[in-house]
Amino acid sequence: MANKKAKKKPTIRTIRAYDIEDSDEGYRVLVDRLWPRGVKKETLQLDEWAKDLAPSSELRKWFGHDPEKWEVFQERYKDELKELKEARRELLDNAGDQTILMIYAAKDGEHNHTVVLEDFLKQG
């Protein structure tokens, strides 16, 4: 019988696109559908742009980064992510053992989709 190794949970950091520095190491993945305004490609030095893992345009527009809609947004986004298990696996495979550096543009670091996405990526 083959001995299956338990997969360890990935190490994930989130960082705003406007705050990233050359010294920020890891598998750099932009997790927004839209490119961050005013940011040059060279600045982010991306390994991947995972548009599919970002909230749908409809959900993003509905949410509008309104903290009062946060609870409902989380549930709706989790429902969208349930359909994206293949995209999740691809990202984790691509990152390998590297720390995943999730890059986003939102101003609010507490009420944005990367909070939900991080949990989704860490689930077994």
Label each PLM-derived region with a short phrase:
Residues A2-G124:
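Residues lining hydrophobic/aromatic ligand-binding pockets adjacent to catalytic sites
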